[in-house]
Structure formats: C-alpha cells, structure tokens
Regions:
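H-loop (His-switch) and adjacent beta-strand-loop-beta switch element
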Residues: 214-226
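ABC family nucleotide-binding domain
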Residues: 4-5, 10-210, 214-217
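ABC-family P-loop ATPase nucleotide-binding domain
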Residues: 1-13, 224-231
C-alpha cells in the first residue's frame, strides 16, 4: 500500500524551562492509503495533539510529517490552509453542525469556503447526503435529526471535498453501542477505499474490531502498533 502519512520524531511541548511539559514526544509512524488506523490511549496521552499536528492545525516543535509525500510544515500558512481544505476531512465528537442552516447547507460549507458556486455546492452536498443515506433529510434543520444521523451529516460534510485523509475524533463517544457500530460499519464498507486513509482517535473498545491497525499511546509516546489478527 502507498504511504499516506509518514511522521518522524514528532514532538510538541507546552511551557518552557522547568515548566516544559511534553504532550507528544518523538512519535514516528506510517499510515497507508486503504487502511483504518486507530489511535488509542488514556486521556492526556497525546492522541488529539498528534492528530492536530498531522492535519496542519498545530505546528510541531520538532519532527516532520508528510501527508501524501508533502512535508506539510514546510508550507506557507496559506498553503497549509489550502491543504486542510482540500486534503483533510474532519469529523468531530460533537459534530459542529450549524442550527440555523439546513442539513444540506451544513454539508456544503467546505465547498462554499472554496468559493464554489452555491447551487453546485448544494447539489454536491445532496449527493453526499445520499451516500450516507440521508438525502431525504437535506432540507431539515440538524435539531430534527437523531445523534446517529447528525454523525452521518458530519461524515458527509467531511467527504464533500473528496479528501485523501479522514480524521475522526471520538466518533462514537456520544452514541449508544448499536448506533456506534452502524456508523463504523458504514465507514468501513462505504467510505474507506484504496485512495483514502482514515485515522480514528477513540477510547471505545467496542469498535476496535473495525481497525486495520491500532496504535497505542501513553504519556505522549507510542507504546506499540498492532495489526488486528483478522485483517
């Protein structure tokens, strides 16, 4: 498989001198197109900080990260913003849906930010709502949707710009077990493909079965990457 992410000695600290605290320390790993990589570990182990550096949100203090063979932190701020808009899709735990917009308008936001025509953006949004099984909910406000449906709207919004890298932060934390498994079945069977890499931060051991590999973190360091036996 082609390498989607190559992180080398990634390090991030906060504070200086005797007050310096390492959030992530010398983390190196590769992730590949066509796989789902879980990043797991206790709260405060550096998982979200690591993904923030990989996705161009938080600059590392040392180390490098290449996404699709591009050293993202060698780019200018404008280039990094363009990289995030075109290459990375985010699905957050609390969805971040705008209550005053329709479901379709929420999904269209990344395209509007890219200055795409409004009507084309809405058509594309409706297509991806269809992909996640919610085209008939396109004109509803998010408050009219269930938690699982809102999560699928967030997935559609992450997909609409056709990113190479999808990042999920605790995607099932606020969902019941059955809904969480349905979301992961959907991600595994409908969203993953050979030209896309999916990274998922989670505490939810109920969904570990959907990972191709699991990277474990403790105290800002990786303590192992394991391939699931049935993959």
């Amino acid at each position: 498989m082609d390498t989607a992410i190559s992180a080398k000695e990634l390090t991030k600290w906060f504070g200086e001198g005797d007050l310096r605290t390492y959030a992530v320390k010398e983390v190196s790993f590769d992730a590949y197109f066509g796989e789902i990589l879980f990043v797991v570990g206790p709260s405060g182990s550096g998982k979200t900080t690591l993904l923030s550096m990989i996705s161009g949100i938080l600059r590392p203090d040392s180390g490098t990260v290449n996404v699709d063979h591009v050293d993202i932190w060698s780019l200018t701020p404008d280039q990094i913003a363009e990289f995030r808009l075109n290459k990375v899709g985010f699905v957050f735990q609390d969805y971040h849906l705008f209550p005053r917009l329709t479901t379709a308008e929420n999904v269209a936001i990344p395209l509007i930010l890219k200055k795409k025509d409004w009507n084309e953006s809405i058509r594309d949004a409706e297509h991806y709502l269809d992909v996640v099984g919610l085209k008939n909910k396109a004109q509803l406000a998010p408050v009219k949707l269930s938690g699982g449906e809102q999560q699928r709207v967030a997935i559609a919004r992450a997909l609409v710009a056709q990113p190479d890298l999808l990042i999920f932060d605790e995607p099932t934390a606020s969902l019941d077990g059955d809904t969480g498994r349905r979301i992961m079945e959907f991600v595994k069977n409908r969203i993953l493909n050979d030209s896309r890499c999916i990274l998922i931060v989670t505490h939810d051991s109920r969904i570990f079965e959907y990972a191709d590999r699991i990277m474990r973190m403790e105290d800002g360091k990786t303590v192992g990457i394991e391939k699931r036996a049935d993959h």
